[in-house]
Amino acid sequence: MSESRLLTLRDYIRWAVSRFHAAGLFFGHGTDNAWDEARHLVLGSLHLPWEISDSYLDCRLEDDERAELAEILRRRIEERIPAAYLLGEAWFCGIPFSVDERVLVPRSPIAELIEQRFAPWLPAEPARILDLCTGSGCIGIACAYAFEQAEVVLADLSFDALEVANVNIERHDLGERVYTVQGDGFAGLPGQRFDLIVSNPPYVDAEDFADMPAEFHHEPELGLACGDDGLDLVRRMLAEAADHLSEKGLLIVEVGNSEVHVQALYPEVDFTWLEFEHGGHGVFMLSAAQCREHRELFRSRLEK
């Protein structure tokens, strides 16, 4: 990297945009284009706010700042590490979260549902919420902000992920009503029921996982891939959900491109597939009554 003429924030953003395009980087871990990615990395690495006035972009950098920035941009380009991991932080629902390679980078369209407080689907204020397959804890913690009286459980199989989730609970000072549980699916929650269960489980099928850009392979495979059709965990979740939902509870699950596999596996079930104004697909909703109605069907499909 020749830096002799790279002096200002604007210089580095412009340079990064050009190099990102030349390297064919993938954008999808918080931004969707080279300009936003470059601005995010340059400002974030120098601990400057995204909303900084454009007049500040012509400020010259100190030598140590230039060296640090050059190294971060090099790693983004050469190693294809997502920006959130390089900065140690990602935003979800307008809330900052600590992240590293033990957890997926937050990016679920479920954020839009949380911001709308799950209207018009949720019949009443939830007293207990479960974020199943929580990872960084972003979905559950965002729900805790949306429903200020709710108790929120963050559950995950990965001890590593739960360490990150606990960092975020402490970061947001929510320890009095948000806590973590380790277990495979519902295994760590015997006898517990919830008014709202939200999950972004691993759902990428084997074919899609093999074809994913290099950036995704920095994320934990446990959080992405889940069997040939991506539904190994979702099958179990559906078979057990009725035992963990309150009388009028809701189950909301993101399955992404595996939506086609869900529809093929359960043609008898009237899933509500939610729509999003800001992009995203493959998120279904079932009521507790539907989960009870189809409990035996769901159990019968545990084996493909």
Curated annotation (Swiss-Prot):
Top-rank EC class of the record's enzyme: transferase
Q: Which UniProt keywords apply?
A: Methyltransferase, S-adenosyl-L-methionine, Transferase
Q: Which InterPro entries match?
A: DNA_methylase_N6_adenine_CS, HemK-like, Ribosome_uL3_MTase, SAM-dependent_MTases_sf, Small_mtfrase_dom
* Record's catalysed reaction(s): L-glutaminyl-[ribosomal protein uL3] + S-adenosyl-L-methionine = N(5)-methyl-L-glutaminyl-[ribosomal protein uL3] + S-adenosyl-L-homocysteine + H(+)
PANTHER family named among the record's database cross-references: 50S RIBOSOMAL PROTEIN L3 GLUTAMINE METHYLTRANSFERASE, RIBOSOMAL PROTEIN UL3 GLUTAMINE METHYLTRANSFERASE
Q: Which family does it belong to?
A: Belongs to the protein N5-glutamine methyltransferase family. PrmB subfamily.
Q: Which NCBIfam families match?
A: hemK_fam, L3_gln_methyl
Can you name this protein?
Ribosomal protein uL3 glutamine methyltransferase
